[in-house]
């Protein structure tokens, strides 16, 4: 994707990232005394933008940063947490009012557009703090309202502009509108807003977001999911782009590979924004099931719309039954595993991609039980050389994907390994690897080379930064401070 001109926060992020290598060199020496520990901690200076340049500040988030930093004795880990956890708020959140209601537009980072997936994931770890901070709660309400608004502009789009300003992809051969940044159909784009709205409601008790705009969004989600089951033909969506990247366009005149209409939902593109090979993307279909059940609960409890709730539940049950029948492949080494993609004709794509939803991340999203034996087999498969996009080198190991290509590991995959781990030593390895592959910047990156972390993509990628903060916060709250302090 082409990147727009960097703004003030972008320049601050890039400058800070490059200026911290001296800090890293000063602070990597092993400390053996309290004095050395204090000196080492002092060497790590915050890489956050100056207070006046931060786009949004939250008292609850700042208090949480202070609390976690006080508990962590590893100065580099504390420094990285301080840099990463608030990165979405510091650099990507644009809060305002629209027609008397909160409205929040969230950049993905160095690309000044709002992805439904990224924005829903970027603000996710702040939801647990919303009850402590009315301003944070209002900002989150604005994200949810903006997501519903985006869905109602076009439920097939993955990324949106802040207004009808057009953009790089207006020449794509699809039903583009100036409000759209990109129109790649991805199931998870409609799931992340449901996940976020549901959790916000559960944490705050605020049901005001479930108004007519919400009901319209639900109708659009249901219609889109059903159209993409393709029971009545290929449906209204197609996509073509003039490009050198094969996975940035769809074959068969923009319709993608054929599918057998067995009840699963087509996802023309993956969460990486790469085209699917077989269009029933399994992790995203699992995500649709859990998201539809959440929507049904809201529609029943808040809107008193049993008709829509029943429609959500029936669709979820249909997709779930089809997953049980078509998603499992009997691997000669790992036994029954979940395929990454299928087509309903018997073809299976055996791989995983780092972007979430992924096969590895399914328990993180609440889509499968972590002790599901098929998931555990799948987890072993994806973290092995049997997965064509698993890379191992001198700097680390992990999952990447065709979006960046050979030998490039996504930190997101290492984070998901930690999120889905039940082994403290494995978690410890994950955190240490993440700390060792930041290239001295104090931030996460989109991907890094398996043999050289200094070779990385995207110095400003808010989702991965905030996700790292979410992981550390989760581990602290689960009583694993001692594990973190052993690093």
Where are these predicted regions, by residue range?
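Bacterial Sec-dependent N-terminal signal peptides
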Residues: 1-24
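Low-complexity, Ser/Thr/Pro/Gly-enriched N-terminal "stalk/linker" regions
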Residues: 24-117
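Acidic, low-complexity proline/glycine-rich segments
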Residues: 36-40, 44-53, 248-264, 486
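Well-ordered alpha-helical scaffold segments within catalytic/enzyme domains
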Residues: 60-74, 121-134, 192-207, 286-305, ...
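Extended, well-ordered alpha-helical scaffold segments
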Residues: 80, 134-150, 207-226, 295, ...
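Aromatic-rich carbohydrate-recognition surfaces in CAZymes
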Residues: 112-140, 144-247, 461-476
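Extended ligand-binding clefts on enzyme/binding-domain cores
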Residues: 116, 152-156, 160-163, 169-178, ...
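C-terminal capping/lid segments that line or modulate ligand- or cofactor-binding pockets
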Residues: 172-178, 183-186, 349-369, 407-487
């Amino acid at each position: 994707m082409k990147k727009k001109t960097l703004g003030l926060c972008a320049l601050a992020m890039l400058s800070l990232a490059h200026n911290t290598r001296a800090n890293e060199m000063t602070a990597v020496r092993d400390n053996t005394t309290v004095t050395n520990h204090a000196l080492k901690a002092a060497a790590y200076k915050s890489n956050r933008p100056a207070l006046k340049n931060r786009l949004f500040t939250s008292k609850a988030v700042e208090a949480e940063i202070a609390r976690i930093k006080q508990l962590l004795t590893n100065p580099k880990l504390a420094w990285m947490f301080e840099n990463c956890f608030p990165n979405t708020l510091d650099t990507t959140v644009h809060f305002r009012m629209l027609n008397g209601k909160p409205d929040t537009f969230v950049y993905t980072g160095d690309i000044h557009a709002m992805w439904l997936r990224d924005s829903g994931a970027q603000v996710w770890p702040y939801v647990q703090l919303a009850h402590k901070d009315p301003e944070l709660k209002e900002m989150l309400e604005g994200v949810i309202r903006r997501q519903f608004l985006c869905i109602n502009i076009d439920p097939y789009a993955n990324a949106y502009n802040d207004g009808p300003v057009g953009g790089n992809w207006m020449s794509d051969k699809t039903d583009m509108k100036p409000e759209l940044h990109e129109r790649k159909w991805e199931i998870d784009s409609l799931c992340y807003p449901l996940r976020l709205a549901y959790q916000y409601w559960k944490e705050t008790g605020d049901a005001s977001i479930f108004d007519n705009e919400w009901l319209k969004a639900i109708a659009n989600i249901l219609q889109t999911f059903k159209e993409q089951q393709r029971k009545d033909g290929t449906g209204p969506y197609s996509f073509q782009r003039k490009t050198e990247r094969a996975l940035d366009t769809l074959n068969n005149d923009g319709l993608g590979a054929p599918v057998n209409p067995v009840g699963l939902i087509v996802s023309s593109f993956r969460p990486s924004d790469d085209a699917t090979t077989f269009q029933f993307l399994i992790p995203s279909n699992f995500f649709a099931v859990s998201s539809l059940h959440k929507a049904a609960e809201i529609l029943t409890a808040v809107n008193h719309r049993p008709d829509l709730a029943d429609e959500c539940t029936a669709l979820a049950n249909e997709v779930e039954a089809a997953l049980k029948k078509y998603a499992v492949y009997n691997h000669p080494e790992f036994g029954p595993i979940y395929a990454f993609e299928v087509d309903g004709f018997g073809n299976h794509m055996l791989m995983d991609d780092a972007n979430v939803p992924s096969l590895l991340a399914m328990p993180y999203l609440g889509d499968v039980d972590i002790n599901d034996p098929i998931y555990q087999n799948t987890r072993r498969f994806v973290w092995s050389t049997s997965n064509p996009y698993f890379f191992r080198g001198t700097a680390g190991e992990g999952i990447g994907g065709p979006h960046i290509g050979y030998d490039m590991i996504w930190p997101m995959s290492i984070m998901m390994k930690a999120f889905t781990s039940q082994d403290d030593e494995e978690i410890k390895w994950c955190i240490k690897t993440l700390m060792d592959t930041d290239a001295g910047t104090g931030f996460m990156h989109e991907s890094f080379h398996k043999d050289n972390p200094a070779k990385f993509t995207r110095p400003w990628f808010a989702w991965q930064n905030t996700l790292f903060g979410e992981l550390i916060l989760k581990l602290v709250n689960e009583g694993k401070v001692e594990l973190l302090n052993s690093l």
